[in-house]
Amino acid sequence: MKLFKMFITLFSLVVLLSCEKNENTNSLKMDLDVVIRETDSIQIYYTQNTSVQFKEKQSFWKKVSGSKKNQTISIVFPDSIHPKQLRIDFGRNIKQSEIILNEIIFSYKKKSFSAKGEEIYHLFRVDESNTLIDKLIGSLKRKDENQLVGPSLYPKGDKLNKQLNQLYSEK
């Protein structure tokens, strides 16, 4: 019994310390609340200035397991990277009929902001060359079902940059 109490105490201490450490990190975390039915990959591009000239070397791939239910996909940027602009490319799986994007949450240190539903499209715009959108239900589809490139979101002007800068500020 004594060993069990000691184990519980030690476990609680580890949990508390790890939670405290995560809140003070200098990493930007982006959570996407999505429905992606087929296994796929998402590519996140970033710039560290206000440019929207996105390059392959400034991007991350995130593998996503298919599910008919909502799932949260978390992208954590290294401490040394504080993106100013972001682009989201939703997959390369041609079998992916649509993606439902419900919410995006950005967290940095103890601050966060989110965009839900149509609010997402105040911060991001769709790439009209390859994306069809239904803002009411958050549906993103390929414009041509045979194209390799999936739906894409680009920053809408400097709105995302301003929100991210507020997140990074010490105030």
What role is predicted for each listed range?
Residues 1-7:
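Bacterial N-terminal signal peptides that target proteins for export
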Residues 15-18:
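C-terminal motif of bacterial Sec signal peptides marking the signal peptidase cleavage site
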Residues 25-32, 78-88, 136-141, 145:
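Noncatalytic modules at the cell exterior or secretory-pathway interfaces
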Residues 34-53, 102-107:
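Extended low-complexity, serine/threonine- and proline-enriched intrinsically disordered segments
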Residues 51-79, 124-126, 132:
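Extracellular carbohydrate recognition and processing domains
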Residues 70-96:
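Extracellular beta-strand ligand-recognition surfaces/modules
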Residues 93-105:
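Extracellular carbohydrate recognition
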Residues 117-161:
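Compositionally biased low-complexity segments at domain edges in trafficked proteins
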